[in-house]
């Protein structure tokens, strides 16, 4: 499982520059996950990010699950604020994101073997 909270993360192609937080790191996360799923010892990879509903952006960001491939998915967790927030405001959303992630994981048939946290905000969530 990859945790990545900032920017507008969706299946490729990456929409570079639509926000200050949507850049090369989004491409890196998608590429890392797509390489990971190609391994013989990996059967499923999810990228967990923040779900939001904001007219300025693609409605896909409000979809709870987006399939990139048969075994590679983006899971979006809602937070208290339903709209897009930039990284400077993201800290206030971490408690509700963490709660949503714990709820999501408690409903999964299998827990992730590995959690890869991208950046400090995701690391704070992963530590719980």
Q: What is the predicted function of each stretch?
A:
Residues 11, 120-125:
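Active-site-proximal flexible loops/turns
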Residues 2-12, 22, 27, 31, ...:
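A conserved catalytic-core segment of Leloir-type glycosyltransferases
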Residues 105-122:
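Short N-terminal targeting/anchoring amphipathic segment
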Residues 1, 126-128:
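Short amphipathic alpha-helices and their capping/turn segments at secondary-structure boundaries
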Residues 36, 125-126:
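Short alpha-helical scaffold segments that flank and stabilize functional sites
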Residues 15-16:
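Intrinsically disordered, low-complexity cytosolic loops and termini enriched
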